[in-house]
Every structure is written in C-alpha cells, then in structure tokens.
Amino acid sequence: MTSHTMVKVVGGWALAGGLSISLAAAQNGNSPGVTDNEIRIGNIMPYSGPASAYSSIGRVQEAYFRKINDEGGINGRKPKFISYDDGYSPPKAVEQARKLVENDDVLLIFSPLGTPSNTAIQKYLNSKKVPQLFVATGTAKFGDPKSFPWTMGWQPSFHSEGGIYAKYVLNHHPDGKIAVLCDRLK
C-alpha cells in the first residue's frame, strides 16, 4: 500500500468515525463547540518540524470536511475544522490544545498526531472532558479508558504491529534480519 493510499484509507475511516460522534453530539445542539449551524472540530498536526512529512494527513482531513460542507454538512450544521501546527513539539501541542479548547471552544480534538504531542495533551483534555479522538499513534497507553475516558486511540499498537510484521518476515523471509524500533514512552 502506498503512503498516498494509506493516508486516504486512514483519513477516510477516521473521519467517518469522528463524524459519527460529532453527529451524535450535534443532535442536542447544546454541547460546547456545537451551534445551530456549526460543529467546531479541533486538530493538532505537525505541519512543520521533524514530522512534517505527515502534514498531508491534516490536509486530507481538512479537504474531507470541506467536502462534507459542500454536501450540506451534518443535520444542517457545517463542521468547522480548526487545525493548528505543533511542529511536533509537546509544549507547542499543549499551547495549541489550550487554544482550541479555551478560545475556539471545540467539541473535540480529532486525530492529533504523534506520541509525544498526544502524551503532552492527554491529561489536560481529559481534565476538561474534551474528547481526544482517534489519536494517531500506536502507543498502547492511548487505549486506557479507565484512566483516560476521554481519549480514544486509532491505530493498532506498535506491539501488535511488530508481531504481525515479525510473523510475515519469518514466513516469507526466514533468513531475513529484523531490527526493532521503539519509543521510550510507557
């Protein structure tokens, strides 16, 4: 699968799930980030910095929300996708999360990218009861609803992915070599 196809697949599924949740919240119209004609959805993405290669994900998400708006929105409400650059810097991610919650009054934070940035904003968003949905990282700690009920991961854990890749290599390249890459966060 090419990276372009992967972005389209991941973006499409994540947006579909996020919009389903947004639709449910929009039904009552009295949630933060929801008005009679708008649903404000926040996003934090590394448009600059060392992970800027992933910025295409944010652009695809923005384009998809534009498409939804062009087709009439959700129950007459237009999603307003507000996406800020964190440069893949945890302190900047915290600043942008606060801006989205406290100034932009978003309903949720949708698909923020990266383990360091999501780690930095997780406690804040949960303390404010702002959904942190479809976290774009494979670190298993983003699948802990008892400790962080307002956070929901998206992709399989890095541990699970590693097992899948190892089985594939062993089955198809039994003499191959395997290198292990891992993050330092628990």
Task: Name what the model sees in each region.
Residues 36-56, 112-113, 177-183:
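Short beta-strand segments enriched in small/hydrophobic residues
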Residues 27-30, 38, 53-59, 71-145, ...:
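Beta-alpha junction/loop-to-helix N-cap segments that form part of ligand/metal-binding clefts
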Residues 61-69:
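Short, well-ordered amphipathic alpha-helices
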Residues 1-40:
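Short, low-complexity disordered leader/linker segments with a strong preference
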Residues 148-186:
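An alpha-beta-alpha
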Residues 48, 87, 115, 159, ...:
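Short, surface-exposed acidic/glycine-rich loop or hinge patches that mediate macromolecular interfaces
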